[in-house]
């Protein structure tokens, strides 16, 4: 059944009404801008990614949506292949800054099994994207696994490691509730760039130079959220089987990896 949710965008700070509706087989995940005449839509696919600075942006014709990674991570982990998402603003609601709200909405709406065979891209050789000391690699693997290492100079963060098999159970327990991170010293700069206008101490893990201003949900919440972003960004390629190993990866590197895999499909 359809289900709705209202909130504000993390970066835009704009209010948004979202309606999640069942979609036929082989539709994919489709965002529909109901605030634009003609209700233009954009399919959640790597070919439609146009920007990866601080968030992942999709664009097709007049339809543009950004910061889609938290929604996409929930759809990926909860095994949702087809859904229409109607939005009257360009950015999904931030919720609590994680994917937990979207996991809850999926469970509340219910999941309908469809009869078309699910297509899965099985990785048969390694793909690697490097950028200085940052990298993301995918290797052949029987299943879907994410191993992420985050390195941050903040004294309370340092090096964090995360390793998990992507399944509805593991995602809900270990990953979905991890929130995006922010630093007070960057806030003015980000807002001058039109970003982080909807960020608060409740929907982000916020640090000043010495302490965490939010209440952490995990000791390693930062790296868990980074792994969440990988799940969301790579679902723009589709379902995959492989082992992703990442060090300080970003939306840009995640998208470049998806494009590298796409070239062989």
PLM feature segments, named:
Residues 1-81, 86-265:
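C-terminal regulatory domains involved in ligand/effector binding and gene-expression control
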């Amino acid at each position: 059944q359809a289900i709705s949710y209202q909130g504000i965008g993390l970066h835009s700070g704009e209010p948004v009404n979202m309606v999640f509706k069942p979609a036929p087989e082989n539709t994919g995940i489709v965002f529909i801008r109901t605030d634009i005449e003609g209700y233009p839509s954009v399919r959640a696919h790597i070919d439609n990614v146009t920007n990866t600075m601080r968030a992942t942006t999709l664009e097709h014709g007049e339809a543009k949506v950004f910061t889609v990674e938290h929604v996409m991570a929930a759809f990926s982990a909860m095994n949702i292949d087809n859904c229409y998402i109607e939005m009257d603003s360009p950015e999904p609601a931030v919720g609590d800054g994680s994917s937990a709200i979207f996991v809850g909405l999926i469970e509340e709406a219910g999941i309908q099994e469809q009869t078309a065979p699910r297509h899965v891209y099985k990785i048969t050789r390694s793909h690697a994207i490097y950028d200085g000391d940052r990298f993301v690699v995918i290797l052949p693997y029987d299943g879907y696994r994410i191993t992420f290492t985050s390195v941050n100079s903040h004294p309370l963060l340092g090096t964090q490691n995360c390793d998990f098999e992507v399944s509805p159970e593991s995602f809900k327990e270990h990953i979905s509730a991890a929130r995006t991170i922010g630093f007070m010293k960057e806030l003015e700069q980000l807002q001058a760039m039109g970003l982080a206008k909807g960020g608060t101490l409740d929907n982000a893990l916020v640090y000043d130079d010495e302490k965490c201003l939010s209440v952490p949900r995990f000791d390693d919440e930062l790296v868990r959220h980074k792994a969440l972003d990988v799940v969301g960004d790579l679902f723009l390629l589709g379902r995959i089987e492989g082992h992703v190993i990442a060090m300080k990866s970003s939306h840009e590197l995640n998208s470049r990896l998806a494009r590298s895999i796409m070239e062989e499909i």
